[in-house]
């Protein structure tokens, strides 16, 4: 193990992924996964040398508390002083940042200004940056923007049908998210298929508590489901996805809610949680649905139907489809969500092999469609942390 270690922090809306990555080998020295943050069930799991240790986050179930637990673990293994730089996933970089950047106060000001555009994620990202600056004073911090991959979308895909003056004044356009994940998954999928990425019309579904789908043609993003903010598109854990904008005026006029309350409801109390009235966690809902919980069943039906509709629509952006790729926590592990979604899409020639679908979970990648089937359906575990580490090393000059 070298001393060229990079700490990567990926603070999601309800999760924390942390990893210490050896820049020379690309190997993960230590990692952690904080799950179900902001709930009483919040836990953080540390992994090192094949050994795992789970610790409850009771009393520290926020992002800052999870980062603090990670930093304590680094000191325990004498890794703290060997960290050379810290890389952070940033959900929304706005129009100003189309690529990764060294973080200074001006960047922090811009990220704070983008909080209204990513109210669940940017505050979590900023918490990670502040914690790293506190525990690693003097070390460079790098922000890797989730929006940058989608800067290649054509104007017809990112333009909203609103007055031009508003679009220009407020940079009001579709940005897209999960770009760091797409940058990793797309070439990995191409490698599995044994074809150049530029020759594959690929649709990638990143499914987690936040979820989006991206159409990739000639190796570049040509359309995506998320828009100005991460609320647009698919049904997610607590976000509603696509909804009639008239809901805002209706609820403010008839339900006694102000705009901020409507915004909080659509971001934090909707999606799978809102439909099921049980949980935002897909694992919990799958178990409950099997046990006869009607709300859980409906939530999963709505989620998979919306996802299938978006997959079909993304084929327009690609001009067809050669490969459908599932990634993200749900996409990588839920055979039921994959099977149900693809069952709507046989008219596109998409099919799933039951045995392969069962096997490709828990870190296993590969093709889950029948061997004689085209287009291909794949599972590819994402590795946003490695992409962030590579960008961080490049910006700070760690060769």
UniProtKB/Swiss-Prot annotation:
EC number(s) reported in the record: 2.7.2.1
UniProt-listed InterPro entries: Ac/propionate_kinase, Aliphatic_acid_kin_short-chain, Aliphatic_acid_kinase_CS, ATPase_NBD
Active site per the UniProt annotation: 146
Organism of origin: Neisseria meningitidis serogroup A / serotype 4A (strain DSM 15465 / Z2491)
Entry keyword set: ATP-binding, Cytoplasm, Kinase, Magnesium, Metal-binding, Nucleotide-binding, Transferase
Binding positions for substrate per the UniProt entry: 89
EC class (word): transferase
UniProt pathway annotation: Metabolic intermediate biosynthesis; acetyl-CoA biosynthesis; acetyl-CoA from acetate: step 1/2
GO biological process: acetate metabolic process; acetyl-CoA biosynthetic process
Cofactor(s) of this protein: Mg(2+); Mn(2+)
Annotated cofactor note: Mg(2+). Can also accept Mn(2+).
Similarity comment: family membership: Belongs to the acetokinase family.
Positions marked as site (Transition state stabilizer): 178, 239
Job of this protein: Catalyzes the formation of acetyl phosphate from acetate and ATP. Can also catalyze the reverse reaction.
Subunit details: Homodimer.
Residues in coiled coil: none
Positions annotated to bind Mg(2+): 10, 384
UniProt name for this protein: Acetate kinase 2
Reaction it catalyzes: acetate + ATP = acetyl phosphate + ADP
Cell compartments where the protein resides: Cytoplasm
GO CC terms in record: cytosol
